[in-house]
Amino acid sequence: MRPAAALVLLTLGLAACAPQAGKAINKDQLDEAVGAAIGDPNTCVVLASRSGKTVVYEFGNYLTCTHPWPDCAGGKRTARDFLNQTIGKAEATRESCASLEDGSRGVAWSAGPTPDPDLAYAAAMEGPNVPPGVVIADKLKAAFEKAGL
């Protein structure tokens, strides 16, 4: 067998084994819908397969999505940490608390299933005027539906 043909077969075989998460996601459409709903410099939204093994979408900059914010229980976590903690739950999880001791800034968390049964999400938003996690959940549900999930 020619090396090029072997490489093509190997690539196709590996691609067939890769996990798939529902239908294709239109990143531009989802960026627009999420940005309009809860867009903020300190917002991170992560979508993953319900198995939690494949992140299929991330909204927000690297620093926001990797920064550990207060978890409202005395610890800290990132949006991906929150996703991993809530991925198997059937109901949405919503939390809100102060992110600074003086209460001048807050953090809100929301995670749960999306309208696409194969996907779950987690979101974190931090800032001086952050809406509660329940509001973020409602706005994201509408954004996901608008984007075709």
Model-identified regions with their sequence ranges:
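Short hydrophobic alpha-helical segments used for membrane anchoring or interfacial signaling
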Residues: 45-51
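N-terminal compositionally biased, intrinsically disordered segments and leader/signal-like regions
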Residues: 12, 54-55
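Sec-dependent bacterial lipoprotein signal peptides
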Residues: 1-15
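Non-catalytic interaction/Regulatory regions outside core domains
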Residues: 17-44, 55-149
